[in-house]
């Protein structure tokens, strides 16, 4: 059995919001060259888990480590090796596409020369829109602009929240190819989703989050589409009882 260097290590994570226990002892590992699809209904804690790993939220208890760095005590080191694409485009409507990337790279301490930024726009077929204000873009174009950051940052770990939501066909095809290449280079991918689409085609493992816990963690290759849906329904309904 192939083993992978652990790039994401989550152990016993608990997160309370008031009296509500959103995460209840979650443990999960994502290795080098692996993509894990974190599948669960709305409100199951998927986004909360990603925010903790991304250093945007502190756990109540438990630990999360990225590239060996603790997500609370070594947040800056974690962010240096991590790429995050949250749900929604998160771009600036009053800036052009090129200005959006220049602003983001400057904040991230990355090179911001025009040739490099234009090449990143070309990766997502937006180079002809470089000088156009983003307020005129479609939802899919805005999502592709957000994804262009992946061509600039070169992280070792990717966190994706509903990665294919809002993408047009060109964007979906580009992202799927980009993620396959990223895995082949030894990167680790953790994707949160409630759909049964392309995320599951890319995933090496499937983790079902229900009732604040990992109800199932299993290799994806052994499961057909009907198996995934059956297991998802069974575990989420059980957690709701």
Task: Give names to the regions the model predicted.
Residues 102, 106-129:
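Conserved ABC ATPase "signature" region
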Residues 62-70, 78:
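Conserved ABC transporter NBD signature motif
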Residues 193-194:
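H-loop/switch region of ABC-family ATPase nucleotide-binding domains
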Residues 54:
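Helix-to-loop junction immediately C-terminal to a conserved catalytic motif
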Residues 158-161:
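Catalytic Walker B motif of ABC-type/P-loop ATPase nucleotide-binding domains
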Residues 39-41:
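The feature captures the beta-strand-to-loop junction immediately N-terminal to the Walker
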